[in-house]
Amino acid sequence: MANKVLRKVTHCVFDMDGLLLDTERLYTVATEMILEPYGKTYPFEIKEQVMGLQTEPLARFMVEHYELPMSWEEYARQQRANTEILMRNAQLMPGAERLLRHLHANKVPFCLATSSGADMVELKTAQHRELFSLFNHKVCGSSDKEVVNGKPAPDIFLVAAGRFGVPPKPSDCLVFEDSPNGVTAANSAGMQVVMVPDPRLSQEKTSHATQVLASLADFKPEQFGLPAFTD
């Protein structure tokens, strides 16, 4: 991938699942618990298609793709029940806490923009309440009425930017994502996007990001005009 021009930004917007919290692995287990009784498997090629989707489109896709004898509502209910059990001990991804505390200490405004509903965000962040209190605000796509269309549509990022005290231009926002759907949404919103993808994703699925990193620990804020780490 050719080097892309990195533009100075003033605000940051973070996805949550698979980026800040190690939840994608737990989602896989929760999904396999539903599929196993029907003799179905959940290969990565399917998982990468639904990463970043909100509850209803994800559930509709799974029921249709696997021809499951249930409604999308029932699928979503089972997924939620499994997830509630598994997510209580979700751990932070490498580099996440350092970056968030650095931005907060340097008064760089940042917010959360996740496809999860507000109640699931509360559940997943239960072990990290203080850290997640540092966000200026949280936009929870599956339960926020202003987010009409989920990722890959740009709605969630535009809503998130609009809720800062002094809303920045989209071009002044830097999005952090792990999913192709999220990257597409950020690009459509007119924002730069740093992607920390699952290493199994093909280069084709990561090529539209402004920058691709193996970990948030590799992020260099000064490349986007933000204060550099001093530790």
Curated annotation (Swiss-Prot):
Cofactor dependence: Mg(2+)
GO MF annotation list: metal ion binding; phosphatase activity; pseudouridine 5'-phosphatase activity
Pfam family, one: Hydrolase
One GO term of the biological process aspect: wound healing
Keywords annotated in UniProt: Hydrolase, Magnesium, Metal-binding, Nucleotide metabolism
Superkingdom as given in the UniProt entry: Eukaryota
CDD domains reported for this sequence: HAD_AtGPP-like (cd07529)
Catalytic activity: psi-UMP + H2O = pseudouridine + phosphate
Active site: residue positions: 15, 17
Family, as annotated: Belongs to the HAD-like hydrolase superfamily. CbbY/CbbZ/Gph/YieH family.
Protein name per its UniProtKB record: Probable pseudouridine-5'-phosphatase
